[in-house]
Amino acid sequence: MAKEFSRTRRIGQQLQQELAVVLQRDMKDPRIGFVTVNDVDVSRDLSYAKVFVTFFEEDKEVVQEKLNALIAAAPYIRTLVAGRMKLRVMPEIRFVYDSSLVEGMRMSNLVSQVINSDKAKQQQFGSVDDVTENDIDEADDTEGKA
């Protein structure tokens, strides 16, 4: 992996902050709604910036519509951000949906479900150490019939 230059990283951080402000305050497009800028990767030559965003929507179609609205507004957003940053050349902005937040929430929910299931089985059978495979199979069978 190539060495990351501190200037590229600093510009990425500043670009992330400025994009967050512009998207929150200056964008009036109702299709976009509330968007979070998670990360910005700037190319070494500063010609491109890949902007990772998330929305508080889980429906894939709605997320795609919002992402398309952002992509369509990218030149305008670039102009607004260029006015706020002191760069000779403003990177071309490319928006990418970051599903890591949604996946993290999904994984957290799955872990919570497993913990709750374990607690229910512990209450039903007593100590977890006393539970045998047959007890678990029987509990699964009775849950399936209910």
Swiss-Prot record:
Its main location: cytoplasm. Keywords: Cytoplasm, Ribosome biogenesis. Transmembrane segments: none annotated. GO terms for biological process: maturation of SSU-rRNA. Residues 130-146 have a biased composition (Acidic residues). Signal peptide: none annotated. It is found in: Cytoplasm. One of its GO terms (cellular component) is cytosol. One of its GO terms (molecular function) is ribosomal small subunit binding. Residues 122-146 are annotated as: Disordered. SUPFAM superfamilies: Ribosome-binding factor A, RbfA. The keyword Translocase does not apply. It holds the Pfam family RBFA. Monomer. Binds 30S ribosomal subunits, but not 50S ribosomal subunits or 70S ribosomes. Belongs to the RbfA family. HAMAP family: RbfA (MF_00003). One of several proteins that assist in the late maturation steps of the functional core of the 30S ribosomal subunit. Associates with free 30S ribosomal subunits (but not with 30S subunits that are part of 70S ribosomes or polysomes). Required for efficient processing of 16S rRNA. May interact with the 5'-terminal helix region of 16S rRNA. This is Ribosome-binding factor A. The gene is rbfA.
